[in-house]
Swiss-Prot record:
Species name: Sendai virus (strain Nagoya) (SeV)
Role according to the record: The different products prevent the establishment of cellular antiviral state by blocking the interferon-alpha/beta (IFN-alpha/beta) and IFN-gamma signaling pathways. They inhibit IFN-alpha/beta induced tyrosine phosphorylation of STAT1 and STAT2. Blocking the IFN-alpha/beta pathway requires binding to STAT1 in the cytoplasm. They inhibit IFN-gamma induced serine phosphorylation of STAT1. Block the IFN-gamma pathway by binding to and stabilizing the parallel form of the STAT1 dimer, further inducing high-molecular-weight complex formation and inhibition of transcription by IFN-gamma.
A single cellular component GO annotation: host cell cytoplasm
PTM summary: Y1 and Y2 proteins are produced not only by alternative initiation, but also by proteolytic cleavage of C'. Only alternative initiation is detected in vitro, whereas in vivo cleavage seems to be predominant.
Pfam family, one: Paramyxo_C
Note from the entry: The C protein is found in virion at a ratio of approximately 40 molecules per virion, presumably associated with the nucleocapsid.
Chief location bin: host cell
Region: Involved in self-degradation and in host STAT1 degradation, residue numbers: 15-22
Subunit structure and binding partners: The different isoforms interact (via C-terminus) with unphosphorylated and phosphorylated human STAT1 (via N-terminus), favoring the formation of parallel STAT1 homodimers. The different isoforms do not interact with host STAT2. C protein interacts with L protein; this interaction has an inhibitory effect on viral transcription and replication.
Gene name for this UniProt entry: P/V/C
Keyword flag Glycosyltransferase: no
UniProt-annotated location(s): Host cytoplasm
Phenotype upon gene inactivation: Knockout of the 4 isoforms completely abolish the ability to suppress the induction of IFN-alpha-stimulated gene products and the subsequent establishment of an anti-viral state.
Protein's UniProt name: Protein C'
Length: 215
C-alpha cells in the first residue's frame, strides 16, 4: 500500500502536490497553535491557584504551618484590639469651644444665658470696659500692646470671645462642682503666669461663672 501511495504521489500533478503540502503545513501550524494555547491556559490556571493559595495563607493563619500561625495570631488580635480602642480615644478628644456642651442641662442653660448677655447686653459692655482698664494699667507686654492698639469695636469683640473661651473651659463635664472649678483653674495656672493678659481675662471669667458652679 505504501508503494501504491508513493506511485500515486509521483504521478500527481505538481500544482496538486503544492496544495497538499500547504494543507499539511497549515494543519501542523493549527495543531501546534492549539498545543501552545492549551499550555498557556494551563499555566494561567496554575498561577491563579497559586495566587489564591498565597492570599488565603496570608489572611488565615490556620492554613499556615503551626509555628507560623502562632506568630501571626497575636498580631491579628492586637490589630483588632487597637481598632476597637481607637473610637474611644477619639471620643475623649474635645475642642475647648465645645466643652460647654457637655455640661449638665441646668449648667448648660445658665452658661449659654451668661454668654448671650456678654455679647448682647450691658454686662458685655461692663466686662470689656473692666478688661480694658485692667490691661491698660498692667505691666506692658506684646499682647497687651496689641490689644490696646486695636480699633475699639474689634477689641471689644476679641475680649468677649476670649472670655467665652475661658467660661467654656471652666464650666464643662456632667456636673461642675466647686472642687472641679478650682482644679481647672490650677491646671491652666502655669500658662497664665506667662500670659498676663489671659490671666486678667481668666480672672474675670472666673468671677462671672462662679454663680453657675454647684456645691
Amino acid at each position: 500500500m505504501a508503494s501504491a501511495t508513493l506511485t500515486a504521489w509521483i504521478k500527481m500533478p505538481s500544482f496538486l502536490k503544492k496544495i497538499l503540502k500547504l494543507r499539511g503545513r497549515r494543519q501542523e501550524d493549527e495543531s501546534r497553535s492549539r498545543m501552545l494555547s492549551d499550555s498557556s491556559m494551563l499555566s494561567c490556571r496554575v498561577n491563579q491557584l497559586t495566587s489564591e493559595g498565597t492570599e488565603a495563607g496570608s489572611t488565615t493563619p490556620s492554613t499556615l504551618p503551626k509555628d507560623q500561625a502562632l506568630l501571626i495570631e497575636p498580631k491579628v488580635r492586637a490589630k483588632e484590639k487597637s481598632q476597637h480602642r481607637r473610637p474611644k480615644i477619639i471620643d475623649q478628644v474635645r475642642r475647648v469651644e465645645s466643652l460647654g456642651e457637655q455640661a449638665s442641662q441646668r449648667q448648660k442653660h445658665m452658661l449659654e444665658t451668661l454668654i448671650n448677655k456678654i455679647y448682647t447686653g450691658p454686662l458685655g459692655e461692663e466686662l470689656v470696659q473692666t478688661l480694658y482698664l485692667r490691661i491698660w494699667t498692667m505691666e506692658e507686654t506684646p499682647e497687651s500692646l496689641k490689644i490696646l492698639q486695636m480699633r475699639e469695636d474689634i477689641r471689644d469683640q476679641v475680649l468677649k470671645m476670649k472670655t467665652e473661651r475661658w467660661l467654656r473651659t471652666l464650666i464643662r463635664g456632667e456636673k461642675t462642682k466647686l472642687k472641679d472649678f478650682q482644679k481647672r483653674y490650677e491646671e491652666v495656672h502655669p500658662y497664665l503666669m506667662k500670659e498676663k493678659v489671659e490671666q486678667v481675662i481668666m480672672e474675670e471669667a472666673w468671677s462671672l461663672a462662679a454663680h453657675i458652679v454647684q456645691e
